[in-house]
Amino acid sequence: MAVASKKIPAPDEVRIKTALLSVSDKSGIVELARHLNDRGVRLVSTGGTHKALADAGLPVSDVSELTGFPEIMDGRVKTLHPGVHGGLLAIRDDAEHAGAMSAHGITAIDLAVINLYPFEEVRAKGGDYPTTVENIDIGGPAMIRASAKNHAYVTVVTDPADYPLLLEEIAGGTTRYAFRQKMAAKAYARTAAYDAAISNWFAEVLDTPMPRHRVIGGVLKEEMRYGENPHQKAGFYVTGDKRPGVATAALLQGKQLSYNNINDTDAAFELVAEFLPEKAPACAIIKHANPCGVATAPSLAEAYRRALACDSTSAFGGIIALNQELDAATAEEIVKLFTEVIIAPSVSDEAKAIIARKPNLRLLATGGLPDPRTPGLTAKTVAGGLLVQTRDDGMIEDIELKVVTKRTPTAQELEDMKFAFKVAKHVKSNAVVYAKGGQTAGIGAGQMSRVDSARIAAIKAEEAAKALGLAEPLTRGSAVASEAFLPFADGLLSAIAAGATAVIQPGGSMRDEEVIAAADEHNVAMVFTGMRHFRH
């Protein structure tokens, strides 16, 4: 049953007389406290915060002066007391509440400056179980929620970045209701995200990827000019996951990334991470979250040139992802064509100077590559719900391939098959990818019919051959990958017509035998992976 409200109007302005300060992140707290003290505000604090303020020479009362009870159990119990929560929750204009405060000697707290134990940071750094549990804050969230609930009378500040706003607000000694309400909303968002991080950590510990309640929390990193289209609003929220990528990257030059830039850059970097840098340099060029070209080569510059050769028209205004440090030679190649974003693990000083010639080109350094095998979750909103699944961490290297045709693929065909299947994993379904010699020869993406994807990829390959002045398209003698099974022989026959000599696909169609027979008829080698890579 809902709790009834006393419906007492909230005052617009509340004078700040007593402030409770209890922070884990102590940045700016001494300066804030000094300003409050100069305004005649009584300072009350706890533990390490009390010590920091006292060491700075500020007059500060220990919270035990409000509670009449010392901190116990290594500080686990210090603010969970009516002397604190009564001071935060009391409705000042209610006679009954005022009487209770007077009877029990409870001091009204007008300002609560609180931030929490660094649970998210400890978790991200891989803290052991006892340490992580010890960094679950109890008293902090309780005080924040109490203060936020009673924002009619109490101002709560949870983010050091808001200290300047607070000082500006209380220049006259009071806070307005609108400000208190805004800070309360931010406070509840903070405790919600904090609890979400704890809940999700327990789900990981207990190996429960789909718990009964799934909470997804994030912190606004930047508000964007617009979303996918100019009439849509957008923001970029970060979860605290340290997986190298666009969320953790340093922007070395260029203007703010757009919504589409972030989406495409993430897709590009996840794709190029499939190729181990110690084996060979790799480059992926992305447009609308689909690859235009992907290649490996002895040098990074050559990998870029080979990736570009697959579809230089579509690559215009695209995203370039590299699996090794961006060097000067590669940078010189990239600046020849209009590019939106470059993302790489690192960037040499020489490359930075070259890219600086294009000041609008966004340059990101991540400090590392994401591990495709690392477990994780992806989420997608639908009307009235949220679709959550584990990340597609399937790797071709971990699959035992099954040769289903009379002819076994050659060693080179097998390498081309694996390369093509890696790329197909990152192409929107229906996906068909031709590859030859560590280079995509043609990519067909996002078609409702798989045979159309095969045809489009072949057409792209023919166009690329003409642009490069080649006698024949690179699909001649190539391997072709399909991210899902070939439902009919028509897709296979289209690939054969384009010149493919080897096919890799998951298998599992009701017409597998028909498709295998068509491959045998044309002396084409085919392997089944048993793993599908749908991407929508």
UniProtKB/Swiss-Prot annotation:
Report the EC code(s) recorded for this entry.
2.1.2.3, 3.5.4.10
Q: Which SMART domains match?
A: AICARFT_IMPCHas (SM00798), MGS (SM00851)
> Could you tell me which pathway this protein works in?
Purine metabolism; IMP biosynthesis via de novo pathway; 5-formamido-1-(5-phospho-D-ribosyl)imidazole-4-carboxamide from 5-amino-1-(5-phospho-D-ribosyl)imidazole-4-carboxamide (10-formyl THF route): step 1/1; Purine metabolism; IMP biosynthesis via de novo pathway; IMP from 5-formamido-1-(5-phospho-D-ribosyl)imidazole-4-carboxamide: step 1/1
Q: Name one GO cellular component term.
A: cytosol
- Which top-rank group of organisms is this from? Bacteria
Q: Is the Transferase keyword given for this protein?
A: yes
Stretches of the chain forming a coiled coil according to its record: none
Report whether Ion transport shows up as a keyword of the record. Answer: no
Q: Which UniProt keywords apply?
A: Hydrolase, Multifunctional enzyme, Purine biosynthesis, Transferase
Q: Which GO terms describe its biological process?
A: 'de novo' IMP biosynthetic process
Query: Pfam families of this UniProt entry?
Result: AICARFT_IMPCHas, MGS
- GO terms for MF: IMP cyclohydrolase activity; phosphoribosylaminoimidazolecarboxamide formyltransferase activity
Q: Which InterPro entries match?
A: AICAR_Tfase_dup_dom_sf, Cytidine_deaminase-like, MGS-like_dom, MGS-like_dom_sf, PurH-like
Q: Where is the MGS-like domain?
A: 8-158
What PROSITE patterns does the record tag this protein with? MGS
Can you state which reaction this protein catalyses? (6R)-10-formyltetrahydrofolate + 5-amino-1-(5-phospho-beta-D-ribosyl)imidazole-4-carboxamide = 5-formamido-1-(5-phospho-D-ribosyl)imidazole-4-carboxamide + (6S)-5,6,7,8-tetrahydrofolate; IMP + H2O = 5-formamido-1-(5-phospho-D-ribosyl)imidazole-4-carboxamide
Q: Which family does it belong to?
A: Belongs to the PurH family.
- Share the domain note from the entry: The IMP cyclohydrolase activity resides in the N-terminal region.
- Annotated protein name in UniProt: Bifunctional purine biosynthesis protein PurH
User: Per the UniProt entry, what species is this protein from, by scientific name?
Assistant: Sinorhizobium medicae (strain WSM419)
